[in-house]
Amino acid sequence: MRKKLWIVVIAAALLCSACAKSDTTKADASKPDADDSFWMSDITDEIFERIKGKSFKDDCTLPREDLRYLHVLHVDLNGETREGEMIVNYHIAEDVLEILRQLYEAKYPIEKIRLVDKYDADDERSMEDNNSSAFNFRFISHTTRVSKHGLGLAVDINTLYNPYTKIVDGERILEPITAEAYLDRDADFPYKIDHEDLCFKLFTEHGFEWGGDWEDRKDYQHFEIPTAQIEEWYPENQ
C-alpha cells in the first residue's frame, strides 16, 4: 500500500514539474500582444514629471486633462517590433491609437515614436533623429493662438524623410536642416509619405489633412485636424 502511495506522489510531482516547465517555455517564447500593447491613459503624475517644463511648458494654456498618453507598438525598417509612446489631444486619441495599430499590423515602417521630451522638446533634434511625435506646446509666432501641435491635434511621422519646406524671399527654409536629400519627392527612398502611402490613407480617412497637399509650403511629415473643427473644440483659440 505504502509503495503504491509513493508511486502516486512521484507521478503527481513529475506532472506538476512538466506543467511548470511548459508554462515557463510558453512565457519565454511569447511576443508582445498587439491588443495588450495599444492603450491610452490620462497624463499621470509620473508622465507629467517627464513633460513638465519641456513639451508642457511653463506658459502652457492647454489643460493637462485635455491630453492623453498613448502606448503603441511599431515596426522599424528591419521589421523589428519596437515600443512607442505619444501624447495627443483627447479628441483624437482613439483615432490616432487605431491608426498606429493598423500601421503596425500592416508592418508599415516607423523608425521611432518617442515623446519629444526625450529631445528636451527641441523639434529640430527630434526631426533629425527621424522621430514621430505629436504634442509640443507653443504659440503661433507673433500671436496668442496655440499651434496645432501645441493643442496635441497634429501628428508628425518619419520626420527626417518627410521634411517641412518653404521658399521665403527667394531662400528655401528646410526643417530639419539635414533633410535636403529627401526634397525630391519623385525619388525612391524609405519612409517616404505620398498619396499612395498607407500612412496618408489612414490619417486622411480619419479626417486629418496632410501638409504635403499645401500650396504655399510643404510639410510632408505632418497630419493635422482641420482648422474649422478645432475652432469648434477651442473657440477661444482664434
Which residue ranges define each predicted feature?
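Positively charged n-region of N-terminal signal peptides that target proteins for export
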Residues: M1-L5
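C-terminal motif of bacterial Sec signal peptides marking the signal peptidase cleavage site
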Residues: L15-A18
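N-terminal, intrinsically disordered, polar/charged segments of Gram-positive cell-envelope systems
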Residues: A20-F56
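Residues that flank catalytic or metal-binding motifs in active/ligand-binding sites
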Residues: D66-R68, N131, G150-L153, C199, ...
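Structured segments of extracytoplasmic/periplasmic soluble domains
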Residues: L73-V75, A93-P109, R138, L160-P163, ...
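Mid-length scaffold segments of soluble, non-membrane domains
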Residues: I110-E111, R125-L160
